[in-house]
Structures are given as C-alpha cells and as structure tokens.
Regions:
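Conserved loop->alpha-helix
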Residues: 1-212
C-alpha cells in the first residue's frame, strides 16, 4: 500500500533490456534506505516494483528492479533510459499517516500530457486518453499520476481529457517539472470509485436483462 506522497525523485543509474524483461536501478537516498530488504516493494512512478538486488554505496542504497513485458506494455517503464528521473515512494507502514489517498501501485494504463499552462504560483497540466479507465475519473475526485495523489481539477469526457493543478511544492518534489507535451504518465484510478462504477454498471445491466 502507498499514500501517493512522493518521497524522493531518483535518476536511473542503468537500464538494461533483455528478452521479455527490462531491468533498471537507482540509488535510494539514505533517508529512505532504512529497513529495505530483498523483496521489498517500492513504488516507481506509481508502479509497485520488487527489489531484486541491492548494494550499499557512499550515496545511499543501490536498488535494482525487474519489469516484465506486461508491466512495460501498460506503463511508461518501456520509455526508461539511463538518467530518467522517477518518482519514488516506500510502501506505507502500519498506522502511517495517509497524506494523499490509498494506492495499490497497480497501474491501469498511461495518459499523454497534452498541454501545460503555467503562471507564477500554479501549473495546470492536461492529460488525454481514450482508454476505458477514463470512466472512473470524476471532477474533484482522486487520481494518481506517476504515483502522486492529486485532485482532478477539470474533466472533459467529449475530448477525453482531464486536468490537474500543481502547486510549486509539488513541482519541486516530483518529476512533473521535467515533463513535456507528449510524455506518457502512469495512471492509477481511485479504487473505491472503480468499485462503485463497476457495481452500478453491473446492477443496471442485470436489470435491463431482466426487463427483456
């Protein structure tokens, strides 16, 4: 479980592509490296990954992860290169404060950044997707973008876009400031909303079937 509060941004130290597998790694800062063990779960751009190897260094803890084909297909992991900056969050501990909203680290797909509007104290980013998961997105509802818990500021279902507002603090602590138009971001929809929408759709379908 994660909270959607990005704890660090890390630059990938290596990316290695193998048959049906992508391996990547980065140096986890000392502030986040306590109690990390092999098999630990860490969210990278919001996607839950398992630590497959680790080694101490002067800078911190070098950790390595594996991404199989399925993970690459539905996330922005397939675009990783050495030097790519990613959002990182350790899994939440019991009784930890949930500063954002509860996340599983299970990505439903990606959205494309279609526009950026900036002024002195705010940045609005608009994302687009024609994927089925867009039906779970609602104005003023939660959404996780690259692992960051955010509020949907605007939604245009006809254009298949949604917008988020970012304060300077969020831009400073995440990789959003490095995004450009056309970049893909990982999306996790809010789980309770997904359950409600799916339940309503199922009940309505059953009622229509009975009426026929």
């Amino acid at each position: 479980m994660y909270t959607g509060i990005v704890q660090a941004t890390c630059a990938l130290s290596f990316v290695e592509r193998k048959p049906n597998l992508l391996q990547f790694g980065f140096c986890l800062p000392e502030t986040l490296s306590a109690d990390v063990t092999l098999g630990a779960s860490i969210a990278v751009n919001g996607c839950c990954f398992t630590v497959t190897s680790m080694a101490r260094s002067v800078q911190g803890l070098n950790v390595t992860f594996d991404a199989i084909d399925e993970t690459q297909a539905i996330t922005n992991v397939k675009h990783f290169e050495q030097g790519t900056v990613v959002n990182v969050e350790r899994s939440a501990k019991q009784n930890a404060e949930v500063g954002g909203h509860v996340l599983s680290g299970h990505i439903v797909g990606t959205a494309e950044l279609v526009s950026i509007e900036k002024d002195e104290n705010r940045c609005r980013m608009t994302f687009g997707s024609d994927a089925p998961w867009l039906k779970y997105v609602f104005e003023k509802g939660y959404i996780a973008v690259n692992g960051a818990s955010l509020t949907v500021a605007a939604l245009d279902r006809s254009a298949q876009t949604f917008a988020i507002n970012l304060i300077p603090e969020t831009l400073e602590r995440t990789n959003f400031s490095l995004l450009s138009v056309g970049d893909p971001v990982n999306i996790e929809v809010e789980s309770q909303t997904q359950v409600i929408v799916d339940t309503v759709e199922r009940v309505m379908a059953e009622r229509y079937a009975q009426a026929d």
